[in-house]
Amino acid sequence: MSILTYSGGSCLAMAGKECFVVISDNRLGEQLKTISMEVPKLHVINDGIVMGLTGLRTDQQTFAQKVNFRTEMYKLREERDINGKAFAALVSSMLYEARFGPWFVEPVIGTIDRKTGEVYLCATDLIGAPCEPEDYVCAGTCAESLHGMCEALWRPGLEPEELFEVAAQAMLSACDRDSLSGYGAVAAIVTKDKLVTRLIKGRKD
């Protein structure tokens, strides 16, 4: 078993019309043993940036703290919030810095420009190689199932409510096919005007 799948868990980011959704499951485990059913993997960086982290839980926590420190330092130095593409570049460079002793995490990043409504999605591997599609990105133990569900359900120009419905159905259906993810999910729905968090009930078995 890969160390990336040891703690289980999956994340998905999906783009719509001037909005995006980042969604993660709630399971934390040690291989097939479930430790907790209330461990979401989303990190709200600011009003327009949400990051999901999958991989080894200890590295998720440490890496999230280091990312938070770097973004706060950026805010102090630049006297403004970091934008989406700069944040993705920051995360990618932090992972590449540690390439010889890597963080066992796979970030999924969703961002929106508050003025223009432009959505930017990015996912990286554990050494920071970015993937920047226009529709959706996913990572975690049920990434293959998520890809299939997203290909079937996603379409361009989805409004926030439709996008949430599609992302939630994709996550729940994919988790039903994976024993290392599941136990419900949590979603962050982000538009130009607001950020809303929703809890999604799922199977508890």
Swiss-Prot record:
The keyword Mitochondrion does not apply. Transmembrane segments: none annotated. It comes from the Eukaryota. InterPro entries: Ntn_hydrolases_N, Proteasome_beta_3, Proteasome_bsu_CS, Proteasome_sua/b, Proteasome_suB-type. It is found in: Cytoplasm; Nucleus. It holds the Pfam family Proteasome. GO terms for molecular function: endopeptidase activity. Keywords: Cytoplasm, Nucleus, Proteasome. Gene3D superfamilies: Glutamine Phosphoribosylpyrophosphate, subunit 1, domain 1. PROSITE patterns: PROTEASOME_BETA_1, PROTEASOME_BETA_2. GO terms for cellular component: cytoplasm; nucleoplasm; proteasome core complex, beta-subunit complex. The keyword Metal-binding does not apply. GO terms for biological process: proteasome-mediated ubiquitin-dependent protein catabolic process; ubiquitin-dependent protein catabolic process. The 26S proteasome consists of a 20S proteasome core and two 19S regulatory subunits. The 20S proteasome core is composed of 28 subunits that are arranged in four stacked rings, resulting in a barrel-shaped structure. The two end rings are each formed by seven alpha subunits, and the two central rings are each formed by seven beta subunits. The catalytic chamber with the active sites is on the inside of the barrel. Non-catalytic component of the proteasome, a multicatalytic proteinase complex which is characterized by its ability to cleave peptides with Arg, Phe, Tyr, Leu, and Glu adjacent to the leaving group at neutral or slightly basic pH. The proteasome has an ATP-dependent proteolytic activity. Belongs to the peptidase T1B family. PANTHER family: METALLOPROTEASE TLDD (PTHR32194), PROTEASOME SUBUNIT BETA TYPE-3 (PTHR32194:SF10). This is Proteasome subunit beta type-3. The gene is PSB3.
